[in-house]
């Protein structure tokens, strides 16, 4: 029986943090045994906001190293860079011509990013969801792991695929969302009301996968809690709940077992143990990261691109012919 194909993309716009790992990458690693996976470094998406070319290039390779260190296996999955497959922007143009302005103007993420960077709003940022649709549809993807903030974009992708198939003939699979039950939203340590982010300015906001042990201890020690002093899984107590969620996801212990473990302990003891759990969980990733050479990264990317290009080419040629393009 043929495995279903999963497509996932990640931007090379900064250091990978614990939220990226628990919310997406750890899930991707677990998917490898069950599905055929394509993991794409979506560097073309990264230029929709200002970014230094040298930084973008170095971060692209650093991200590949970290994904490999986390457990993405080139023997099980295709790992490649978006800009090395020319059909991504080519198909995006075909899809651009099928989507109304009204549908695009309803995209909430464009509005949010425009407010944060009003001087840097460009057409690429507006068209971001169409390029994302192209990324997914090129590979006849069955499933797409998405967080809450990407659900609207996947819905647009589904609508675009259905409309194209209806207007021109069957071309695209209509992908389904694959949503992790837990871990999809890890919040900031210093502000548990916002999702952990690479771009947040707070020095103690995020734990990065390459943070030294003493840095991790310091960040967790300063993490927001409350004045109640009771360690329990209560979503209304955002700070404590966020830290407990991290502990649960890394330790694989049940909420009941964790609450029992810390029943008569204070936040100081809990944070100390949480820091140790985080440090021990990241240790093998950090060790593997140091072992990966630049040559290994390039070999993995070449192999991934060779796997991706024929799939993308076949879909693009079919879409092009159905639209009457020579």
Curated annotation (Swiss-Prot):
<protein>
    <recommendedName>
        <fullName>Tryptophan--tRNA ligase</fullName>
        <ecNumber>6.1.1.2</ecNumber>
    </recommendedName>
</protein>
<comment type="subunit">
    <text>Homodimer.</text>
</comment>
<feature type="binding site">
    <location>
        <begin position="11"/>
        <end position="13"/>
    </location>
    <ligand>
        <name>ATP</name>
    </ligand>
</feature>
<dbReference type="GO" id="GO:0006436">
    <property type="term" value="P:tryptophanyl-tRNA aminoacylation"/>
</dbReference>
<comment type="similarity">
    <text>Belongs to the class-I aminoacyl-tRNA synthetase family.</text>
</comment>
<feature type="binding site">
    <location>
        <position position="186"/>
    </location>
    <ligand>
        <name>ATP</name>
    </ligand>
</feature>
<dbReference type="GO" id="GO:0005524">
    <property type="term" value="F:ATP binding"/>
</dbReference>
<feature type="binding site">
    <location>
        <begin position="19"/>
        <end position="20"/>
    </location>
    <ligand>
        <name>ATP</name>
    </ligand>
</feature>
<feature type="binding site">
    <location>
        <position position="135"/>
    </location>
    <ligand>
        <name>L-tryptophan</name>
    </ligand>
</feature>
<feature type="short sequence motif" description="'HIGH' region">
    <location>
        <begin position="12"/>
        <end position="20"/>
    </location>
</feature>
<dbReference type="InterPro" id="IPR024109">
    <property type="entry name" value="Trp-tRNA-ligase_bac-type"/>
</dbReference>
<dbReference type="GO" id="GO:0005829">
    <property type="term" value="C:cytosol"/>
</dbReference>
<comment type="function">
    <text>Catalyzes the attachment of tryptophan to tRNA(Trp).</text>
</comment>
<feature type="short sequence motif" description="'KMSKS' region">
    <location>
        <begin position="195"/>
        <end position="199"/>
    </location>
</feature>
<dbReference type="InterPro" id="IPR002306">
    <property type="entry name" value="Trp-tRNA-ligase"/>
</dbReference>
<feature type="binding site">
    <location>
        <begin position="195"/>
        <end position="199"/>
    </location>
    <ligand>
        <name>ATP</name>
    </ligand>
</feature>
<dbReference type="InterPro" id="IPR001412">
    <property type="entry name" value="aa-tRNA-synth_I_CS"/>
</dbReference>
<feature type="binding site">
    <location>
        <begin position="147"/>
        <end position="149"/>
    </location>
    <ligand>
        <name>ATP</name>
    </ligand>
</feature>
<keyword id="KW-0547">Nucleotide-binding</keyword>
<dbReference type="InterPro" id="IPR002305">
    <property type="entry name" value="aa-tRNA-synth_Ic"/>
</dbReference>
<keyword id="KW-0963">Cytoplasm</keyword>
<dbReference type="InterPro" id="IPR014729">
    <property type="entry name" value="Rossmann-like_a/b/a_fold"/>
</dbReference>
<keyword id="KW-0067">ATP-binding</keyword>
<keyword id="KW-0030">Aminoacyl-tRNA synthetase</keyword>
<keyword id="KW-0436">Ligase</keyword>
<dbReference type="Pfam" id="PF00579">
    <property type="entry name" value="tRNA-synt_1b"/>
</dbReference>
<dbReference type="InterPro" id="IPR050203">
    <property type="entry name" value="Trp-tRNA_synthetase"/>
</dbReference>
<keyword id="KW-0648">Protein biosynthesis</keyword>
<dbReference type="GO" id="GO:0004830">
    <property type="term" value="F:tryptophan-tRNA ligase activity"/>
</dbReference>
